[in-house]
């Protein structure tokens, strides 16, 4: 059986398969979680729930760090007979490291230096899992930028290009990596099947791209509209994201251009080493950027997003 943890207010629009069962989980309360999970016994758990945008930095910790702690604590207290627990973390836990050219791949042996509240909250969740040690069968996945159907951040780029504007930041070379959502799913199932306890794996499509590669492919799939390509210095982005953050807090609506986004867009090196995932999990990405963008844009068109 497959169960999906949802909130009472969660949309189930894309969870229409009749084989899916639903369970309401409140990750903010261990007491509530214990009541909700006690009647069940799960063999495998994929913890992909998390916040990527918050008005206040502390909210990242409440959801991404504390929510993970609460879930794991309750599973241990209930002595749930879990075979494997896959935690979906992020490459963002490492922050801007190995930024000297020529850029080198970020590896599992590097010291994380997260520069976003999101990355810091994910790292704290990882460290909590590490602190439990062999008492809990966990595997951690660290995908780079994930794109595909229903993803909203990269969709904003496609929407902007359709409106004839492509915006980039910084004049220093930027090496970017991507991973299509289906390749992340592949890695999740491989980790569930034979992942080694306590191991951590980076995920990408195995290639490295320059900053314009993604927008060029979007442009191609949109029929090559004319575009105004704007490349602004980093200090302009700093001003825009500062006011975006301020207005977001004033209006209660988080801006896509905020303080975390500033650090993400400013970062120049997103290379990562996926060899351990390939060697140990048997992970082999099937969606290079051109194929993935084609599928993503088709979905956006078919579903009226573009």
Language-model-detected regions and their locations in the chain:
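Amphipathic terminal alpha-helices
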Residues: 272-280, 284-306
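Substrate-positioning beta->alpha
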Residues: 124, 151-156, 169-192, 198-199
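Conserved Rossmann-fold NAD(P)-dependent oxidoreductase catalytic core, especially the SDR/UDP-sugar
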Residues: 69-117, 139
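Conserved C-terminal active-site "lid" loop/helix of NAD(P)H-dependent oxidoreductases
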Residues: 181, 216, 240-284
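Flexible, glycine-rich beta-alpha linker
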Residues: 94, 139-156
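NAD(P)H-binding glycine-rich loop region in Rossmannoid oxidoreductase-like domains
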Residues: 21-66, 91-96
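Active-site Tyr-X1-5-Lys
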Residues: 113-141
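Mid/C-terminal beta-alpha module of Rossmann-like enzyme folds, strongest
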Residues: 191-257, 290, 294-297, 304-305
